[in-house]
Regions:
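Transmembrane alpha-helices and adjacent helix-loop boundaries
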Residues: 3-172
Length: 172
């Protein structure tokens, strides 16, 4: 048999004619991804602090949240938020449901990333800060969270890129 050469020509006219839809999609990606990243990161950091708590019930509650959300697909979470809130009688716009789904998802992943960063801080540094008279809040901010954020920056950046890509799941 003879090989037949393939000649493909991409028609950019169809892309250019759909340019407004591409721009609208890019804008919606930004509108969903940026707030979900910020709110999810703050929530994940609070969850990570909760997972390191002395209170057993708080550790278990935060751990259960993280494990459930990390072990269910994002699409299932989106369906649960959209249809679950509606079945409870709460009227939520599609945008709000999508944003809430992304926030609760990225918070669970950010929690584990931040917890790993916090656990990497040597206990001696925390004890030294306490001996210097820093309050618990000051110790967490200056000695634990800020250095942990520097250590986990690459992992957090990757997670936020994945969030931006996953925002396409929420399209209508």
């Amino acid at each position: 048999t003879r090989a037949v050469p393939m000649t493909y020509a991409f028609d950019f006219a169809s892309v250019l004619s759909s340019w407004p839809q591409f721009l609208e999609g890019a804008w919606m990606t930004i509108l969903l991804s940026f707030p979900a990243t910020v709110i999810g990161f703050v929530g994940g950091t609070l969850l990570a602090i909760g997972r390191r708590s002395d209170k057993r019930w708080l550790v278990n509650a935060c751990g259960a949240y993280v494990e459930v959300l990390r072990n269910t697909p994002l699409l299932v979470q989106v369906f649960l938020v959209c249809f679950g809130l509606a079945s409870l009688g709460w009227k939520v716009s599609a945008f709000s449901a999508a944003l809430l789904s992304l926030v609760i998802n990225v918070a669970a992943y950010s929690c584990e990333i931040m917890r790993a960063g916090m656990d990497s801080i040597h206990k001696g540094q925390i004890e030294a800060a306490e001996c210097l008279g820093l309050t618990r809040r000051q110790v967490y901010w200056h000695v634990v969270i800020r250095p942990a954020m520097e250590k986990v920056y690459p992992a957090l950046t990757s997670q936020f890129v994945l969030l931006m890509l996953a925002s396409s799941i929420t399209s209508q």
